[in-house]
Amino acid sequence: MFKKNINIKIKTKILNLRKKIEMWNNNYYVKNLSLVSDEKYDSTLFELNELEKKYSMFLNTSYSNKIVAKNICNKFKKIKHLSNMLSLESIFNYKNLLNFHEKVKKNLFYNEKRYYCCELKIDGLAINLIYKNGILDSASTRGDGLQGEDVTKNALEIKSIPHILKKNNLSFPKKIEIRGEVFIKLSTFNKINKMLKSKRKKLFSNARNMASGSLRQINPKITKNRSLSFYGYGIGYVNEKKYYYDQHDALKLINSWGIPIEKNTELCKSLNEVKNFYEKSIKIRDYLDFNIDGIVVKVNSMKLQKKLGCSSKYPRWAIAYKFSSEEKCTKILGVNFNVGRTGVITPVAKLKPVYFMGTIIKYSSLHNKDIIDKLGIMINDTVCLKKSGDVIPKISRVIFEKRKNVKEIIFPKTCIFCKSKIEFCLRKKNLYCTGGFLCYAQRKQLLNHFVSREALNIKGMGNKIISQLIEKKIIKYPSDIFKLNTDKIIFLKGMGLKSSENLIKEIIKSKTTELYRVIYGIGIPNVGIYTSMNLANYYKNISNFINTSYEDLRSIKGIGSFTSNCIKKFLKDKRNISIISDLLNVNLKIK
């Protein structure tokens, strides 16, 4: 009886999961609506797959949770694929990758090498191109894997899809399927959304939805105006065996025919190299002009691919290794502006508190105006927070469907702490307060930096002591530190006679120091400890340094034009020269 009840619960769970997947698929692929995050979809699909494996008695052979939608959108005629166009099974951790690797290993021929072709998994829409004698004959979406929607007219409007293949030393096959991904560059996505916003039209929620909706238009002119992009990622059917290339070589072949391919692809000769490629992909994803949600790991050998074959849902020779991340949605209540040590003004979103991965998140950095414009963030927007690994959660996207009563984020024209002039750094895309030590927000951080271990190394003078001294208006500039005595610090919270005497000893000790420590300690923007050492080795004394020229700085190995400009700008400011002079006037001895 107990076992029967358990089975009923399991069956109900499986049926409910199937209904969810079907509903999400239908909305996404037919109506162009994304109801859930990628992570939620993937985790639900993974849960269903695991339950079906474990409880095979409930596996319905007429149901495939990977069929895109029961009804492919009927506004396009259908094209049957020459070879099945299956989706990839998704994995989310190294253990899953190891399991995939072990399954591949079991099917190896004697002494056969286990090479993997690793590619970035572009978050777009799969497309199947059929070329006959080098001329584009048709283009179709993945559809249900057996047949897809005819989008040939629209594909002809995508500049990166060649209408005629380029000739090389190898003649074209009579018939070949070239498969790839249609996507929209993030720069284009933001440009189009900005234009839609100006016309008070509905915005696209993400780049993939825009790409999908743009490819599946009745009017090809709309597709043309959306400036879609395409990368090829492999060959499906080909009518001649001489074109049976291993995956990595197949990419080179189609590229030689004029098919664009993603340039970060690597041939990995070990599982460790695959792991390294995955980790590298995480690091570069924020610098790409298109979205990726993982990597694709393919067995490189065509012979081994054929031996491994496919299940009813997936090829057994490839896997999608997704980036592990979690997502939570919340609301932006307002934006504060923080000023850093070097004057960088950072917008910080004040969020409706949300419990996320063990902590309550109330704030999230927006970094700079470029990021705000790129994501289209406004006050009162509902946004998604994403966290990968141990990285601090960041805002990954805006849910435009929930947008109402929003306000534009207005950047200050003068510093909110000291009213100093604000300047824009084109290279770093940041706004800067020019106040320096005059700015209360910068002063505390600059003085903390000045006494730090790499700079003057004044032991015992931490953040709490400096904060109290600033609040009581005892110190304002670095030279004021060397005017302190026990009478001025003994009454500070946490200080007594002994600790005050010890601190004064450390201050006196630090008055004899090295040139690189002073250069580093005065806090020149974009001048770190190693650059400071480089400068000290070259100039030998403080006088030579403060009287340097731009040309002189550029002649120093390792110091580029940007850093040289930062140094010259700092030394041109009379306030900064005054700070250095004041240090010399309190008998700072620089070796």
Curated annotation (Swiss-Prot):
Assigned keywords, A-Z: DNA damage, DNA repair, DNA replication, Ligase, Magnesium, Manganese, Metal-binding, NAD, Zinc
CDD domains according to UniProt: LIGANc
Transmembrane intervals: none
Annotated positions binding Zn(2+): C415, C418, C433, C439
Cofactor(s) annotated in UniProt: Mg(2+); Mn(2+)
Active-site residues annotated for this sequence: K121
GO molecular function, one term: DNA ligase (NAD+) activity
Gene Ontology biological process: DNA repair; DNA replication
Reaction catalysed by this enzyme: NAD(+) + (deoxyribonucleotide)n-3'-hydroxyl + 5'-phospho-(deoxyribonucleotide)m = (deoxyribonucleotide)n+m + AMP + beta-nicotinamide D-nucleotide
Zinc listed as a keyword: yes
Annotated EC: 6.5.1.2
Domain of life: Bacteria
Descriptive protein name: DNA ligase
Organism field: Wigglesworthia glossinidia brevipalpis
Lineage, uppermost ranks: Bacteria, Pseudomonadati, Pseudomonadota, Gammaproteobacteria, Enterobacterales
Recorded name of the encoding gene: ligA
